[in-house]
Design a protein with these regions (language model features):
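C-terminal catalytic/acceptor-binding lobe
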Residues: 2-5, 15-23, 29, 183-316
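A conserved acidic beta->alpha catalytic loop
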Residues: 13, 18, 25-26, 32-34, ...
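Active-site-proximal specificity loops/subdomain of glycosyltransferases
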Residues: 42-85
Length: 316
């Protein structure tokens, strides 16, 4: 077994609105990975056709409801990986790495860390239709808090750096605790990053999930399980791979309404234990697929407008 065989990439492809940008970004992402082992989980909504051609490296799953499925899909993929896989990198299918040796570097860092963010800086590229627009540069979460630990206590996304895009951890962590998969409008990467450093009730988290809400309590239980697994493995804290990541354009960030979407979910009283049905080997389902939460989710995903040609910086 080589070190290269020990790490697999898992990514997801979910395109119920049929965005052209998402298809093209996935093609560029997958091509850039080269021969690095990668399993793509494609999720089709209801009776929509799958877009990716059949392949041993594509796991097709069908969802009943329109919601944020990414973390659930990644969790379902883990059992499909070969036993030679000891580390898993979960990566958004719209990024490109500047540093090609990131897999080896990540494995070295995972000898002592719970998880590794696979970049130190991200460049959000402009729309291909507006190539003269300036890219937006952002420091990564782990690089930021390593250099400025006080950034964690500020309670603002822009203060502590970007929490998303590309991470890696031990397969055994994902088998025992999984990723947190009940953020049904997204932002799981943000709240998980705080849990990785032992702050599951940080201001950033309570702003998104609510203070003393059922959603927050559900997240705290997952966080406690994660820390227990980390202790049993003798790993802790976070590392990062120094290097730049390019994020391919797919619509205006403002159309994703990062804070507003979670605020609305709180107003609707979302409780994962009550409102989600966990079916083995399937994406999550809503218990009430015609209720106010389902209606909100359908409207939200329809308004993301990922084929738009302008972008703006987000603060959450």
């Amino acid at each position: 077994m080589t070190k290269r065989d020990a790490l697999w990439v898992v990514t997801t492809y979910f395109n119920p609105a049929g965005y052209r940008s998402r298809r093209e970004n996935y093609r560029r992402f997958r091509t850039a990975l080269g021969d690095l082992p990668c399993l793509t989980v494609e999720c089709a909504l209801a009776d929509q056709p799958f877009e990716l051609p059949p392949s041993p490296d594509v796991l097709p799953l069908r969802a009943h409801d329109a919601l944020w499925h990414k973390e659930r899909l990644i969790n379902l993929a883990i059992s499909k990986l070969p036993r030679s896989c000891h580390f898993v990198a979960w990566i958004d299918a719209d990024v490109l790495f500047q540093r090609l040796d990131w897999p080896a570097r990540a494995q070295t860092l995972l000898d002592r860390h719970l998880a590794v963010q696979l970049f130190s800086d991200v460049v959000q590229l402009p729309s291909p239709q507006r190539p003269d627009d300036l890219p937006i540069r952002t420091r990564g979460f782990v690089a930021t808090i390593t250099e400025k630990p006080d950034a964690l206590s500020v309670g603002r996304f822009d203060a502590h750096g970007h929490t998303g895009y590309a991470w890696a951890t031990h397969r055994s962590v994902l088998e025992a605790a999984g990723l947190y998969d009940a953020c049904i409008v997204g932002s799981a990467d943000h709240v998980m990053a705080h849990a990785f450093v032992g702050h599951p009730t940080a201001t950033c988290v309570t702003r998104l999930l609510g203070d003393h809400s059922p959603h927050l309590r559900h997240f705290e239980r997952w966080s406690a399980r994660l820390q227990s697994v980390a202790e049993s493995l003798g790993v802790s804290g976070l590392g990062f791979v120094s290097g730049e990541l390019s994020h391919l354009f797919h619509g205006a960030i403002s159309d994703r309404r990062y804070f507003e979407r979670n605020q609305r979910l709180r107003q609707l009283g979302f409780d994962p234990t009550r409102d989600l049905i966990e079916v083995p080997d399937e994406p999550h389902r809503l218990r009430d697929d015609a209720g106010p939460i389902a209606c909100f989710l359908r409207d939200y995903f329809a308004q993301r407008n990922e084929d738009a040609v302008t972008d703006e910086k987000s603060s959450v």
